[in-house]
Structures are given as C-alpha cells and as structure tokens.
C-alpha cells in the first residue's frame, strides 16, 4: 500500500476538521522493519500483561493493525522479538503500542511496522487480564475497532473510514 500521511492530511482537511480523521501526538518511536503500514485496527486494552497481545497475534492478522493501549506504562515491555515475528508470520500490517517494546534489534528484522513509546528490557506479567475489541485511547486519541490506521515516518493517522 502506497500512501503518505502528509498527503492524506492535505487531501482530507474536511475530515480533520470534522474529527473523523485524527492525528496521534508525535510521541511514538519506530521499532519494526516496515516504516509504512496501514490497516483496520484490532484493539486491546491491557496493563503490564501481554497475554492478550500474544493471543491476538497468534490469529490471522489479515492486514490489520493491532493497537495496544498499555496505559502508557514504562515499567515493562508488551511486545518483543518473538511477538514481532509472530505478527509477520500471521499477516499483521503493524502493531501500535501505547507502552514499551523490547528486543529492538529483533523487531527491526521483522517485516511489520511496530511503534511504541520506548524500549524496556523487562517482560510483562502473564495474568490474562485485559479487554479485546473495545475502544482504546492512545496518546489522548480514541481509537475504535475497525477504524483505519495509517503510519509512516511523518506520523500516525486514525480514520473512521479507509482513505486509500
């Protein structure tokens, strides 16, 4: 899929004004091997527990983007190299983590986009806590399941509908 978030913003100023196209605050850093990715959002709300993240990535991604609202925790990682490889194997376009990742060198080798706040060497808990397919909030922006995510070097967009 070829697009530029800058061009999408320019072409859809009406959607930006209406709030059906939103721009995430520029605080996420790239860690995956794909610099540009897009797809409908699958959402998770978790806190310092990545059990649901693994369960989601074990499923066929079908070109979707997994959006993980990790509560902006900087105390452990929710995604690492093994989950990045799993996402690539199962056809996920990308992963957006409102929290941390680890195994940064391994994530760079995966042909999937990965964005997160930071890296952290500690793994998460495995309690199975969290919610799936619910509206989440990432950097103050609400993202509902099925909304479209567009990410590249210039930023991340959330759209109520497909723009390409």
Curated annotation (Swiss-Prot):
GO terms for biological process: regulation of RNA metabolic process. The keyword NADP does not apply. The keyword Mitochondrion does not apply. This is Putative 4-hydroxy-4-methyl-2-oxoglutarate aldolase. GO terms for molecular function: 4-hydroxy-4-methyl-2-oxoglutarate aldolase activity; metal ion binding; oxaloacetate decarboxylase activity; ribonuclease inhibitor activity. Pfam families: RraA-like (PF03737). It comes from Burkholderia multivorans (strain ATCC 17616 / 249). A divalent metal cation binds at residue 103.
